């Protein structure tokens, strides 16, 4: 599991928009679920894909619980929490602000494709959606981020 720790934490840190404490909690929950479910791993997908899917599900469940309780102050996955081009400090736009304009699905696709160098097929497996949908999310994400500049 040690070989997957850094990549998984980086993935979760980006999903949580830099919230280190939440990242630690989600990573711990992910590894606990993996340990408990290890016998059910069938080997159909690569282990890393299975691990990231569990992590993504943990994040998604966290977001859903926050929304249901009305506590989603960070706006995880909330496209309404967008940044206008006029809010940018000169020409430097940091990654966190770029990620905030994306929906949860777009952000996940971007992180997996550009930061983790995952192929489209693996991203589709992790996100449980067709490859064409992943490509659409990436395309929309690029368009949204381009508007910021």
Please identify what each model-predicted range represents:
Residues 61, 68-95, 99, 119:
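Internal acidic/polar
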Residues 36, 40-43, 53-73, 88:
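Arg/Lys-rich amphipathic alpha helix in sigma70-family domain 2
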Residues 4, 137-140:
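Residues within the DNA-recognition helix of helix-turn-helix
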Residues 109-113:
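A short pre-motif secondary-structure segment
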Residues 10-29, 131, 148:
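Short, charged helix-capping/linker segments at alpha-helix termini
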Residues 64, 139-149:
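Short, Lys/Arg-enriched C-terminal cap helix and immediately downstream tail that follows
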Residues 25-32, 45-57:
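Structural recognition of an alpha-helix C-terminal capping motif at a helix-to-coil junction
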Residues 1-20, 37, 99:
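Amphipathic, Lys/Arg- and hydrophobic-enriched alpha-helical face
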């Amino acid at each position: 599991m040690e070989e997957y720790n850094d990549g998984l934490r980086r993935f979760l840190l980006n999903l949580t928009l830099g919230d280190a404490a939440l990242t630690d909690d989600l990573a711990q929950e992910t590894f606990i679920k993996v340990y408990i479910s290890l016998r059910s791993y069938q080997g159909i997908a690569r282990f890393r894909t299975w691990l990231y899917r569990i992590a993504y599900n943990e994040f998604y469940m966290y977001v859903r619980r926050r929304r249901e309780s009305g506590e989603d102050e960070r706006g995880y996955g909330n496209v309404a929490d967008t940044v206008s081009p006029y809010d940018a400090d000169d020409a430097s736009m940091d990654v966190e602000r770029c990620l905030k304009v994306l929906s949860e699905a777009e952000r996940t696709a971007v992180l997996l494709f550009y930061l983790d160098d995952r192929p489209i097929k693996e991203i589709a497996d992790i996100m449980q959606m067709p490859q064409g949908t992943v490509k659409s999310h990436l395309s929309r994400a690029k368009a949204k981020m381009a508007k910021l500049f």
